[in-house]
Amino acid sequence: MLSTALNAETLTIERIFSSPSLDGNAPRALKVSPDGERVTFLKGKQTDYERLDLWEYHIESGETRMLFDSNDLQSGEEVLSDEEKARRERMRLSGSGIVSYQWSDDGKALLFPLGGDVFYHKLGEKGAKQLLDTEAFETDIKLSPKGNYISFIRDQNLYVKHIASGKETAITKEGGGNIKFGMAEFVAQEEMGRMTGYWWSPDESKIAFTKVDESPVDVITRSE
């Protein structure tokens, strides 16, 4: 007669909702490059599933490799602004490190935020160029349609920066307090699923943006 001793760990409610995830270290945010040659994705570290790095799978060769290690580009604990915390929660973005990224329309470059700053990688070149390095926490970062500029929100104002020259321009300057430029207000994010407040024209010569004035909204203290 054979007997088998099962030493399985008892599954508790606390374990279900704690790290590491029970579904394993699955890739996230999979995207096919515009030229169709590779698939990029985010994947957690073996030592911490919630600390994400940027990877690629080359379709023709079958090679999988890490493009960027988030620890190499940013050291220390990531401190998010309140606006970024709320934005990530509504976009269902979890984890730390490289939590999002985007391809340029021509498939020749990648842009990704990390720790409130911005990194840019041109295919065929080594490393990532840090385009922003400030005390502020930039959010809603985008590549312009032709890939010549990045745009972002800083301190409730809209900015653009020319990648080649490094010239930065404030599109708005009056943001702050109850005034927000280029930012989706609470109702837009929560009820409409709109997470941005500005849009490039296809030829990247113009930007349409919103102005939100929350001055008429009553401030109510909520005790939790």
Model feature map: region roles:
Residues L2-E224:
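Beta-propeller folds
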